[in-house]
C-alpha cells in the first residue's frame, strides 16, 4: 500500500469509494448525488490537494480530498449544488446550516477535508498517513489550518481525529461535529 498524489486515472475509483462509504440513505441511493457533494469538486478543481491510498496494483482504495480556501470553494461549488437538484429540501437546509456554522472558524481553519477508506485499508494506520500527507502539503502552501465535519454519532471518528491532534470546534449534537487542526502559527 502506498500514499500518493491523486492521478486522473483514480477518478472513478475515488467516486466509487465516495459512494461505497456513504451512510445517509439519499447518498446510498445515488452515486451521482453523493459524488457531486463530496468528491467531484475536489477532483475537478483542486486535484493537487487530493491524495490516495493505493493498493499493490496501484488502485485507489482510499482518499483524502481538500479545498484549501473555504470562500473559493463556496463560490465554485454552486454549479455542483445546482446539479444536485434532486437533493431533498431538508438536506439542502442542513448543508447550508453546516456551511454557515463553519463560517466562524474559516479564518483560522480555511481548508477543509474529506477522507474515506474502503474496509480493506481501514485500521492499519493509513488514515493517519493520509492526514499527514495532506497536512504537510497544505502547510507547505502556507495554509493556516484545516477542519472537517463528522457525524455526531460516529464516536470512532471522533476518537481518530482527536488522536491525530484535531480539536473540537463545534458540536451540533446528533447533527455532527466540526474538528480543526492548526497547521501554522
What are these regions (language model features)?
Residues 2-16, 68:
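A short beta-loop-alpha structural element at the N-terminal edge
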Residues 5, 16-32, 41-42:
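Helix-loop element at the rim of GNAT/NAT acetyltransferase active sites that forms part
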Residues 29-50, 56:
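Active-site rim helix/loop that mediates acceptor-substrate recognition in acyltransferases
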Residues 52, 59-68:
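Conserved beta-strand in the GNAT
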Residues 70-114:
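Conserved acyl-donor/pantetheine-binding loop and adjacent beta-alpha core of acyl/acetyltransferases
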Residues 108-111, 138-151:
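Conserved GNAT acetyl-CoA-binding A-motif
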Residues 114, 123-140, 159-163:
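Conserved acetyl-CoA-binding loop-helix of GNAT-fold acetyltransferases
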Residues 144-158, 163-185:
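C-terminal "cap" of GNAT-fold acetyltransferases
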Amino acid at each position: 500500500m502506498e500514499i500518493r498524489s491523486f492521478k486522473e486515472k483514480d477518478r472513478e475509483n475515488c467516486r466509487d469509494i465516495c459512494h461505497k462509504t456513504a451512510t445517509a440513505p439519499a447518498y446510498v441511493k445515488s452515486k451521482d448525488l453523493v459524488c457531486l457533494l463530496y468528491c467531484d469538486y475536489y477532483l475537478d478543481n483542486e486535484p493537487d490537494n487530493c491524495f490516495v491510498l493505493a493498493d499493490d496494483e496501484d488502485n485507489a482504495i482510499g482518499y483524502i480530498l481538500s479545498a484549501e480556501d473555504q470562500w473559493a470553494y463556496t463560490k465554485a461549488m454552486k454549479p455542483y449544488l445546482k446539479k444536485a437538484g434532486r437533493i431533498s429540501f431538508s438536506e439542502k437546509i442542513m448543508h447550508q446550516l453546516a456551511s454557515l456554522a463553519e463560517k466562524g472558524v474559516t479564518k483560522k481553519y480555511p481548508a477543509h477535508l474529506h477522507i474515506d477508506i474502503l474496509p480493506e485499508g481501514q485500521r492499519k494506520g493509513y488514515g493517519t498517513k493520509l492526514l499527514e500527507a495532506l497536512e504537510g502539503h497544505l502547510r507547505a502552501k502556507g495554509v493556516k489550518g484545516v477542519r472537517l465535519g463528522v457525524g455526531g454519532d460516529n464516536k470512532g471518528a471522533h476518537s481518530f481525529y482527536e488522536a491525530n491532534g484535531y480539536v473540537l470546534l463545534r458540536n451540533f449534537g446528533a447533527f455532527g461535529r466540526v474538528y480543526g487542526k492548526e497547521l501554522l502559527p
